[in-house]
Amino acid sequence: MNFMSFFKRPSTAPVAKDRLKLLLAHERVAIGNSDVVALLREEIVAVIAKHFPVESNAIKVRMETGEAISTLEVEVEIPTPLCVNVRLNANDDAKKKAEHQSRPIEAAAGG
């Protein structure tokens, strides 16, 4: 170490370069999250659809990125068994009503 270099100010270029690297890395992570969230959403929809009769638009996936932590929030609207049965019964009732209305009048009166 040279005696004259002891009193010399350190160059700010390496510090600025390190800060720029950190900033670029942070931005790349933030930009890449949209792809990650879309991929996660597709996989979550596929897994849930195996077990529950849900529509794709009933599943919402959000990622919030903070300074120290990122949070993945998944909101799923799963129909209760009662709702599924009511829908099935309503469809069956509609089919029966349609079949009854499509019968000829003579057959219904003759029986």
UniProtKB/Swiss-Prot annotation:
Any one Gene Ontology BP term: cell division
Intrachain disulfide bonds: none
Keywords: Cell cycle, Cell division
This protein's record includes keyword Cell division: yes
Entry annotated with the keyword Transcription regulation: no
InterPro entries xref list: MinE (IPR005527), MinE_sf (IPR036707)
Pfam families: MinE
Database matches in HAMAP family: MinE
Role of this protein: Prevents the cell division inhibition by proteins MinC and MinD at internal division sites while permitting inhibition at polar sites. This ensures cell division at the proper site by restricting the formation of a division septum at the midpoint of the long axis of the cell.
Family of this protein: Belongs to the MinE family.
Name the record gives this protein: Cell division topological specificity factor
Species in which this protein is naturally found: Methylocella silvestris (strain DSM 15510 / CIP 108128 / LMG 27833 / NCIMB 13906 / BL2)
